[in-house]
Amino acid sequence: LRNIRGADLHLGSPTTAGRPAAGYTGLFLRMPRAWTGGEVIAAGDPTVGDLMGRAADWVGFTGQHDDVDGGATVLAFAGTSSAAPAIRWFIRSEPTPVLAPSPSFDQEIVLRDGEELALTHRHVFLDRVWRAAELAELAEELHP
């Protein structure tokens, strides 16, 4: 993202504007409705509540599809940002399951005129529900 506005560009979130635990920015995945209450798996094995606004190398989100379609898993890596704030996770399984590596969760990024912000992401979409141990092994293998 290059700022061609002719003035500073302030990139923030509802949390940087004062709303707690609402730091959704960047690439935002809204999971299927059927995944409400799905399992969140992360590096170091924190619970989903412990992940909100925190840094982790990777997270996985698993859920069952409606009726007879089985389940699936999304493995997401935090990625990188050329800006100073560390990428933090905006993640929840209820009331709406979502997953977002957030570059400005609780700290605004100020992009000066002519400056660029570079973000990298890696997401892996898997066709079944993966257990924590096997997902950790895959994350180790695929880590960028």
Mark where each language-model region is.
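Asparagine-centered strand-capping/turn motif at beta-strand->loop junctions
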Residues: 3-5
